[in-house]
Amino acid sequence: MSHKNIWNKHSRTYGKGSRGCRICGNRSGLIRKYGLSICRQCFREKSQNLGFDKYR
């Protein structure tokens, strides 16, 4: 039994383990609103390119 067989016994189709950032693949701090699916770190870098404006 290898390490992968122990921890990845079944595929993740729902929950936090199934989703990741479409830019870096990170699974924490994910912004899913408006179908973005981008982590908050990448959102801060790419928000101007996506058309979001900073008001403060």
From Swiss-Prot:
Q: What gene is this protein a product of? A: rps29A
Q: Which family does it belong to?
A: Belongs to the universal ribosomal protein uS14 family.
Residues annotated as binding Zn(2+) are: 21, 24, 39, 42
Task: Identify which cofactors the protein needs according to its UniProt entry.
Answer: Zn(2+)
User: Is Zinc a UniProt keyword of this protein?
Assistant: yes
The protein here is known as Small ribosomal subunit protein uS14
Q: Establish whether keyword Ribonucleoprotein is in the entry.
A: yes
The UniProt note on the cofactor reads as follows: Binds 1 zinc ion per subunit.
Q: Which InterPro entries match?
A: Ribosomal_uS14 (IPR001209), Ribosomal_uS14_CS (IPR018271), RIbosomal_uS14_euk_arc (IPR039744), Ribosomal_uS14_sf (IPR043140)
- GO molecular function, one example? structural constituent of ribosome
Name a single GO cellular component. Answer: cytosolic small ribosomal subunit
Q: Which UniProt keywords apply?
A: Metal-binding, Ribonucleoprotein, Ribosomal protein, Zinc
